[in-house]
């Protein structure tokens, strides 16, 4: 049986860049890594609490962290930044204060920037959140997958594969269902493929959603 490698790690340095950009001594590396995780979790929790969205999509595509000795620069790539900014007029400042408290950064400045991504539904994280919202509302998984594929087609991608695993539709036996539209060349390294794995808690148990999106070839 073929073993699947993570498409993002497989393409690092060719079509994929790192989401954290900093250097540290080997003995301090683990602290830096934990700090990154803390920043990402804190931002996601804040957005979840303070954004009231009808579709259940928070719309965070990715969070990039750049560190220097005296500065931490956090760039949040969002599909719908208006929702965050409109729901709280001082949303970004509040988030910055929360993060500073959480990290306890005394002699370092923290900077947060929010960047809008052009085609939100061309991003697997946002799409996975959309599918998760549908499954929580007990929409049948096939309908949710088809709707997601329609949304990505509007975002002008070359191919998409969606996989849902777990107790689908509340069935006793867990199974894996998947659907593919267009091309998804996972073994071609120069193919720009975006990927995300997302867990969703439904009343029947946990479902895993995986999404591969083939954007273009270099």
Curated annotation (Swiss-Prot):
The cellular location(s) given in this protein's UniProt record come to: Plastid, Chloroplast
An annotated GO cellular component of this protein is: chloroplast
Q: Which NCBIfam families match?
A: rpsC_bact (TIGR01009)
Q: PROSITE patterns, per this entry?
A: KH_TYPE_2, RIBOSOMAL_S3
By sequence similarity, the record places it as follows: Belongs to the universal ribosomal protein uS3 family.
Q: What positions does the domain KH type-2 occupy?
A: 47-118
Gene Ontology biological process terms in this record: translation
- Its predominant location is plastid
> What terms describe the molecular function in GO for this protein?
rRNA binding; structural constituent of ribosome
Per its UniProt record, what Pfam families does this chain match?
Answer: Ribosomal_S3_C
Record's protein name = Small ribosomal subunit protein uS3c
This protein's gene is called rps3
* Subunit comment: Part of the 30S ribosomal subunit.
Q: Which UniProt keywords apply?
A: Chloroplast, Plastid, Ribonucleoprotein, Ribosomal protein, RNA-binding, rRNA-binding
Classification from the root reads: Eukaryota, Viridiplantae, Streptophyta, Embryophyta, Tracheophyta
The organism of origin for this protein: Atropa belladonna
């Amino acid at each position: 049986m073929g073993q699947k490698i993570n498409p993002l790690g497989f393409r690092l340095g060719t079509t994929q860049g790192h989401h954290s950009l900093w250097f540290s001594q080997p003995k301090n590396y683990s602290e830096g890594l934990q700090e990154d995780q803390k920043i990402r979790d804190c931002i996601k929790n804040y957005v979840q609490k303070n954004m009231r969205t009808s579709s259940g999509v928070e719309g965070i595509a990715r969070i990039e962290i750049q560190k220097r000795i005296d500065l931490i620069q956090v760039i949040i790539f969002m599909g719908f930044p208006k929702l965050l900014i409109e729901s709280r007029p001082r949303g970004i400042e509040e988030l910055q204060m929360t993060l500073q408290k959480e990290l306890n950064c005394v002699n370092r400045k923290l900077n947060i920037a929010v960047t809008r991504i052009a085609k939100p539904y061309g991003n697997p994280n946002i799409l996975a959140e959309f599918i998760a919202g549908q499954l929580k509302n007990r929409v049948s998984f096939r309908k949710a997958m088809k709707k997601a594929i329609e949304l990505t087609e509007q975002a002008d991608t070359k191919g998409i594969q969606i996989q849902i695993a777990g107790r689908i539709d509340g069935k006793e036996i867990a199974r894996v269902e998947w659907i593919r539209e267009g091309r998804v060349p996972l073994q071609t390294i120069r193919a720009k493929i975006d990927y995300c794995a997302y867990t969703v808690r439904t009343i029947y148990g946990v479902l895993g959603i995986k999404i591969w999106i083939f954007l273009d070839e270099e």
